[in-house]
Amino acid sequence: IDVAFLNEVVYGAKNFLEGKLGRKLPDVDLPAWLSYLALDAGLREQENEVEVLLVHTPAADVLKCCEPSDVNKLNHQACRTPLGEFAFSSVTSSGLVSTEELFLDLMNLALDSADVKCLMLLPFHQVYGNGVEEKLAGFFKDKNEEERGKAVYFITEEPLSPVYCRLEPVFYSLAHAFGIKSDEL
């Protein structure tokens, strides 16, 4: 998860939805939202081990509109949900590489790992989505459907070219995490 993307999307969606619904929305319960994303990705109740990598710059260490919100305090923490255990790791670019390069490197490592059964991606689409989409397309183009199901790319808008993996909209799980019912939308 790119923290800058999460902050922009969650903050923007919260402000938009509060205006549309005419009421104040709670901050997002981060473990609950991650559970909704995992369900969208196909995980079901069992003993899943979900590693959540929070990729950020040193200055962006707070999750806006989320609880818990301190990225550094989340580092090396875990929580259990009916889907399994979510273990958090804070990964910072520390100025050595860009967040984009770090995200793409971590994504490539996970794609190549036999230990990773499902890779859920939330990059900063507006900043480096094209790079993510090019890498995904190159990796999955010649793979079969089962192999293509390894990655779930959470999107705010449709990619301009095929990425050859599963696409899921991020908005519905976020609306659910805000406590919004489908008939309110």
Q: PLM features: what roles do these ranges have?
A:
Residues 89-93, 135-185:
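Eukaryote-biased recognition of electropositive, low-complexity segments
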